[in-house]
């Protein structure tokens, strides 16, 4: 029985380590002050948080079943009902912004601030 539990635990742990989420900034329109955050995920996503630098975030669209909170540099998306974003790829959120000064727009560099669960 212990051997069976160990195998199940090891399998779950390996699957957790192999799950991945990739983000990319696309469709940047500096005149309109919008950009899309595109996501590819091989596991359901129950929430997200990321920072964007070299702009001031005004707002972000809401994935179905989620609440979104923004600060001037961070987007946080979560569900109070247990909703998840299914496996796949597509636009995660569209961000509205100001104060673009011609620099590159990039994600936060500290992995501790870019979280998916």
What are these regions (language model features)?
Residues 18-117:
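Acidic, low-complexity intrinsically disordered segments
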Residues 1-4:
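Positively charged n-region of N-terminal signal peptides that target proteins for export
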Residues 7-16:
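Bacterial N-terminal signal peptides
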